[in-house]
Each structure stands twice: as C-alpha cells, then as structure tokens.
C-alpha cells in the first residue's frame, strides 16, 4: 500500500495538472469505485460537476481535492483512496483507455482528463463535507495555505494525526503521546491516530536509522530517542520523495505513469540476508502483524522486555 511519499508524489502531480480547472463530467466505470460514497455514483458525479478543483491536499496517506464554487468557497472535497493499487493519471482525452480504468473526470478547458486506474479495486472516491480541523491548524499540506478550505479537512479523515513532514506537526506532543502508549514501537508508528503516513516500509527504515528495535516498549523511549526516530522518518521520507517514491512493481506511479526508484536505496526493508549498510551484520526478517519486519541484529538489538 502506498505510504506518505508515494501519495505526496501523486498530490504534487495533481496540483500541477488539475488544480484550478473546472470539472465538466465524471464517469465511473466500476461499482466499487464509489462504494465509500453512500449516495452512489450519480450523486458523486453531480457533486463535482461545475466545481473548481481548488487544491490538492494531503495528510499522511490521505489525499483530497477541495471543490470550490466560482466565488472560491469550498464546503466539500473529493477524497481519493488509492488503496493497494490505485493510480491517478493525467491523460489526453483521446488516449486509449487503460485495462483497469475505473473513473474519468473531464474539464471544461478541453485539456487532459484525470483518470483513476485500480487493478485490485480496493481504492475509490467519495465526495464528503469539509469540517474544521480539531487543532485549528491547516488540514494538511496543499498548494494554497490561505484558501478558505485550508483550516478544514474531510469529515472521515478528521481522526487522522498529522504526519512528520507537516509543518504543524508537534514533536513534543508526539514524544509524550508515544510514551503514554503500552505497545511496541513499530505498532505505535503504524497507528495513524498517533502519526500518519507511516507504513511498513518507512517504519523499518526509520527504526534502522534511529537504531531502535521495532519491539521496544513505547514507555521506555526517551525524548532523545523519539527525536532520533522523527529525524529518521523525515530523512527517509524526504529521500523517497526525491526519488519519486518506492515502487516494487508497476502499481505505484506518478500522474504521468512513471515509477519511483527509492527501492534501490532501502537499508533493511526487503533486504533479508544482506549486509547492514552500517555494520555489515546480516539483515533479519521477523513475522510481524501478518507482514514482516526487517532489522539489523547488531544496530537494533532486541530490548530486555520486548513488546511483540
């Protein structure tokens, strides 16, 4: 599933090619694409037609497009769930349809279409109300911080925490809330109500950078270690963004269909049996929450009282 860097790559592409354009039509080609929009596909289409895509905003792994009236007011947004394999692509109107095309939006300027392609159909869209953010800050990272919608976010996303690349992220609050938990460190990182945007790949990479074992009890994490962990998250996510994200297959692409290449720079994730780039010990893989955790047995020793 795409994590923060992959979604941010898509957000930037949508911001460049779609923001500021007026939707003229919406066509949904698979019933699952609007399953999160309770009123159905016809209603989803009607609530976008004639409105301007005012911005492309991201918080963690969540992406939404505020929909504004001609006077600039945005009371709703289209939330895009990429799921396991969702892709937002900008294509010429006469380009051949992709095999797994699920939705198409056209615009009144007659330019390129926005297409949603999803092989596994776990993704989808929903048009939902915007609500004020719980902390009064910006909803997420967008292109127009002074827009009328900037202090709001989609109602279904309101419980999601800020992500480490969000300028409004509070490091001290994160460290305090982390120590209040009674769980393992990686489990906490995957909890989107504590910190958003972190999935299996970047959790493993950040823990390696901070020299912390994934099963370390959160209550034992010192402020200095929490700071090192956040630094690791920001470092690996920024590097992944520069590389266009991590692509292990053709499913994670930007709006022009190009895959990222950060998978070539991973230190431990997916590197079982290969030498740790820091100490040379062989990277190990452990079963973890129906997935895998990768770590260095020397740089990231198992704590005395692990919380598996």
Curated annotation (Swiss-Prot):
The keyword Nuclease does not apply. GO terms for biological process: base-excision repair. Binds 1 zinc ion per subunit. It catalyses: Hydrolysis of DNA containing ring-opened 7-methylguanine residues, releasing 2,6-diamino-4-hydroxy-5-(N-methyl)formamidopyrimidine; 2'-deoxyribonucleotide-(2'-deoxyribose 5'-phosphate)-2'-deoxyribonucleotide-DNA = a 3'-end 2'-deoxyribonucleotide-(2,3-dehydro-2,3-deoxyribose 5'-phosphate)-DNA + a 5'-end 5'-phospho-2'-deoxyribonucleoside-DNA + H(+). Its cofactor is Zn(2+). DNA binds at residues 100, 120, 181. The keyword Metal-binding applies. Transmembrane segments: none annotated. InterPro entries: DNA_glyclase/AP_lyase_DNA-bd, Formamido-pyr_DNA_Glyclase, FPG_cat, MutM-like_N-ter, Ribosomal_uS13-like_H2TH, Znf_DNA_glyclase/AP_lyase, Znf_FPG/IleRS. A zinc finger (FPG-type) spans 267-301. Monomer. Belongs to the FPG family. Involved in base excision repair of DNA damaged by oxidation or by mutagenic agents. Acts as a DNA glycosylase that recognizes and removes damaged bases. Has a preference for oxidized purines, such as 7,8-dihydro-8-oxoguanine (8-oxoG). Has AP (apurinic/apyrimidinic) lyase activity and introduces nicks in the DNA strand. Cleaves the DNA backbone by beta-delta elimination to generate a single-strand break at the site of the removed base with both 3'- and 5'-phosphates. This is Formamidopyrimidine-DNA glycosylase. The gene is mutM.
């Amino acid at each position: 599933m795409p994590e923060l860097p992959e979604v941010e790559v898509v957000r930037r592409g949508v911001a460049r090619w779609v923001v500021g354009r007026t939707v003229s039509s919406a066509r949904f080609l698979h019933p699952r694409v609007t399953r999160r929009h309770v009123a159905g596909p016809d209603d989803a289409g009607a609530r976008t037609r004639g409105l301007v895509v005012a911005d492309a905003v991201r918080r963690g792994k969540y992406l939404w497009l505020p929909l504004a009236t001609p006077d600039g007011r945005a009371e709703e947004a289209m939330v895009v769930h990429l799921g396991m394999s969702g892709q937002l692509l900008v294509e010429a109107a006469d380009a051949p349809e992709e095999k797994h095309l699920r939705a198409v939006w056209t615009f009144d300027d007659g330019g390129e279409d926005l297409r949603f392609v999803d092989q596994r159909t776990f993704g989808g869209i929903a048009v939902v109300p915007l609500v004020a953010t719980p902390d009064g800050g910006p909803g997420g990272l967008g292109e127009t911080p002074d827009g009328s919608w900037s202090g709001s976010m989609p109602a279904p996303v309101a419980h999601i925490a800020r992500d480490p690349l969000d300028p409004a992220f509070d490091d001290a609050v994160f460290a305090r809330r982390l120590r209040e938990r009674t769980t393992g460190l990686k489990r906490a990182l995957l909890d989107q109500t504590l910190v958003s945007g972190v999935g299996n790949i970047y959790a493993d990479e950040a823990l390696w950078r901070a020299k912390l074992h994934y099963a370390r009890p959160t209550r034992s994490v010192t402020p200095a270690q929490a700071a090192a962990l956040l630094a690791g998250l920001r470092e690996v996510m920024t590097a992944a963004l520069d590389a266009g994200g991590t692509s292990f297959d053709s499913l994670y692409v930007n709006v022009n269909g190009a895959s990222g290449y950060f998978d070539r720079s991973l230190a431990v994730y997916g590197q079982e049996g290969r030498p740790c780039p820091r100490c040379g010990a062989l990277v190990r893989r452990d079963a973890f929450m129906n997935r895998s955790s990768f770590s260095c047995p020397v740089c990231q020793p198992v704590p005395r009282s692990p919380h598996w």
